[in-house]
A protein has these predicted regions:
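Conserved acidic carboxylate
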Residues: 9
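Charged docking surfaces used in two-component/phosphorelay signaling
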Residues: 16-24
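Short hydrophobic/Thr-rich beta-strand motif most characteristic of the beta2 strand and flanking loop
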Residues: 26-33, 41-42
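Conserved Asp/Asn-Gly motif in the active-site loop of CheY-like receiver
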Residues: 32-36, 109
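Active-site residues of response regulator receiver
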Residues: 53, 83
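The feature encodes the CheY-like receiver
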Residues: 57, 75, 87, 105-106
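C-terminal output helix
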Residues: 107-116
Length: 121
C-alpha cells in the first residue's frame, strides 16, 4: 500500500511542481487548495504526511496545522511547512503552530524528498 501525502497549496503551479517532483516515487498524492479543504481532506483521507503552504485562502496553513494537532485522532500526522517566507523566525512560527518540520522555498526535489522520507520511511 502506498503512503498518502496531502499537498495543501493554493497556487496551481506550485501544486504541479510538487506533483512533478513526487512523480514516480510511489506516493499517492492528493491536494487541497485552501485551509477548509485541507481540514476536510485530512479527516476523510487520513494521509501519512501533509505538505502545508503557510499562506492559504480561508485559513492560513498555520491555523490548519493548529487545528489538526489539536485533534487527538489526527495529531500524529506529520506536517511539513513549505513556505516562500524564508524570513528569520518563520521556522519558529511554523513549529509553534504544530508543524513538525519546515522547508523554505526555493528547494530542490532532493531536499523535499529527503524531508518526506525522513517521516515516511
Amino acid at each position: 500500500m502506498s503512503k498518502r501525502i496531502l499537498v495543501v497549496e493554493d497556487q496551481p503551479d506550485n501544486r504541479q511542481i510538487i506533483r512533478d517532483m513526487l512523480a514516480g516515487t510511489g506516493y499517492e498524492i492528493s491536494e487541497a487548495e485552501d485551509g477548509e479543504q485541507a481540514l476536510v481532506a485530512v479527516a476523510k483521507q487520513r494521509p501519512q504526511l501533509i505538505l502545508m503552504s503557510a499562506q492559504l485562502p480561508t485559513m492560513d496553513g498555520y491555523e490548519v496545522a493548529r487545528q489538526i494537532k489539536a485533534d487527538p485522532a489526527l495529531r500524529s500526522i506529520p506536517i511539513i511547512a513549505v513556505t516562500s517566507h524564508a524570513l528569520n523566525g518563520e521556522e519558529k512560527t511554523a513549529r509553534a503552530a504544530g508543524c513538525d518540520d519546515y522547508v523554505p522555498e526555493p528547494y530542490s526535489p532532493r531536499q523535499l524528498l529527503a524531508k518526506i522520507r525522513q517521516y515516511l520511511s
